[in-house]
Design a protein with these regions (language model features):
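Gly/Pro/Ser/Thr-rich low-complexity, intrinsically disordered segments predominantly at protein N-termini
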Residues: 1-190
């Protein structure tokens, strides 16, 4: 089912009946259409997912790539009609399996990775940063394919603050997963 042109505020109940091919996020009830990812975006996402999945094999945490619905502020008694914010991070790392259900993740993932594109750069750096901070995401990676860099932000005193900056030949430490390191030369295709 397509988005209703008459309706101005949406919930997770609406989201659940939309066409799966549409890439839409809900931000405080507003439907935000997302552009389809580029080939470079998908290659970077695939390599990050592969390295994370290899590290997490046999462990309790899971790395889940988009499309994957994350209801950042869903409460225990909320119904789909109550939830007004649903995002689809490029990669979500969840260590509390009780947050996982048939529709995605209830609450904040431990770590979120967003891969920038020209159309999402502002959205990922401002809107989503604010949402992830409010929700209590512990670690947020902002990956820039054009600059071949990774910016790592960690939650400190309820604020996501810059912690580390890595370039294409670096080895990035995943703070949310003890002992996990990502080889960026493989992520950026070298």
């Amino acid at each position: 089912m397509a988005l209703s042109a008459e309706k101005t505020s949406f919930t997770f109940a609406d989201y659940l009946v939309w066409d799966e091919d549409e890439h839409i996020e809900l931000i405080d009830g507003e439907a935000v259409r997302m552009a389809p990812p580029s080939t470079v975006h998908q290659l970077i996402s695939g390599e990050l997912s592969r390295q994370l999945a290899n590290f997490l094999e046999g462990k309790k945490c899971r790395a889940i790539p988009a499309p994957f619905a994350v209801r950042l502020f869903e409460g225990a008694d909320d119904t789909p009609a109550d939830v007004q914010t649903v995002v689809e991070p490029d990669i979500s790392v969840i260590c509390d399996r009780s947050k996982l259900d048939e529709h995605g993740c209830k609450g904040a993932p431990d770590m979120v990775i967003e891969i920038l594109s020209p159309s999402t750069r502002r959205h990922d750096r401002l809107v989503k940063l604010n949402l992830y901070q409010r929700a209590g995401v512990k670690e947020y990676w902002i990956v820039s394919p054009s600059d071949q860099t990774v910016e790592v932000l960690l939650l400190k005193d309820s604020w996501l603050v810059p912690h580390a900056f890595y370039e294409k030949d670096g080895i990035a430490k995943v703070n949310a997963l003890e002992g996990c390191f990502i080889e960026l030369c493989k992520v950026f295709g070298e």
